[in-house]
Amino acid sequence: MKKIAIFAKVHDPRCQGVAGELITWLEQRRIVPLVEAHFARHLGRSGVTSEEIPDLADMAVVLGGDGTLISAARLLGGREIPILGVNLGSLGFLTEVTLDELYPALEACLGGDYRVSERMMLAATVERGDDIVFSHRVLNDAVINKGALARIVDMESLVNGHYLTTYKADGLIISTPTGSTGYCLSANGPIVHPDLECLTITPICPHTLTNRPIVLEASAEVTIRLISKNEDVYLTLDGQVGMELKCGDIIRVRRAEHRTRLVMSRSKDYFEVLRTKLKWGER
């Protein structure tokens, strides 16, 4: 690996300090650190644009929490570059490597001794009339939800063109297995092992209590048509990118062509991470 991209929380002093040390460590090994220009200015360095990074990097290191990693994954998803997540945040389902483990993990990666978890992504589009007005890749989830003062949302749903139901709810979450421990979990959705290939539809506070989460095959295409008029409704992707929806908009969600490749610790298994992060067995 000759070039490694570094992503971090821009205004976090701790991330800035760790990034500076990491840059020095990489340069001592004749590896070119690629830092996005805005963050690079905080480090007193020159950088590259975020659009250039996917074509230049052989690997990426993310310093922060899951939100920072998810943002990097959407940027890099089209290239399937391995991403090493270092947890400097709080929960850290995806950034499972600790700061103490950073340099041993990097040494292992440079030596080719690392394990990669291939994570399914989603492609979400919004159609308005005959036009596609919004298109994005998603690692965790695509969420349709109402604004603070909006009433219940009516959404017609189809799977592979077949009518499923018309949801009356505060919103709807369409998630990947990776996203099952995110918003989906808070809405009483199932925890899905990240190695599985599937989509999950989870209603948010449905008006009908028999509307339960549904797990679909990975090849399924979920189509949602917004029926509600004059309501404040939004589509949010990974909790970071979104747009306001209008009555009649059609949202299509399907498996994306590319995946996110996460570098995982060989010393930890998924169930250990799950047990630790969710504090199972504690009183």
UniProtKB/Swiss-Prot annotation:
The keyword NADP applies. Belongs to the NAD kinase family. The lineage of its organism: Bacteria, Pseudomonadati, Thermodesulfobacteriota, Desulfuromonadia, Geobacterales. NAD(+) binds at D66, G67, N140, D141, R151, K168, D170, T181, G182, Y183, C184, L185, S186, Q240. It is found in: Cytoplasm. This is NAD kinase. GO terms for biological process: NAD metabolic process; NADP biosynthetic process. Its cofactor is a divalent metal cation.
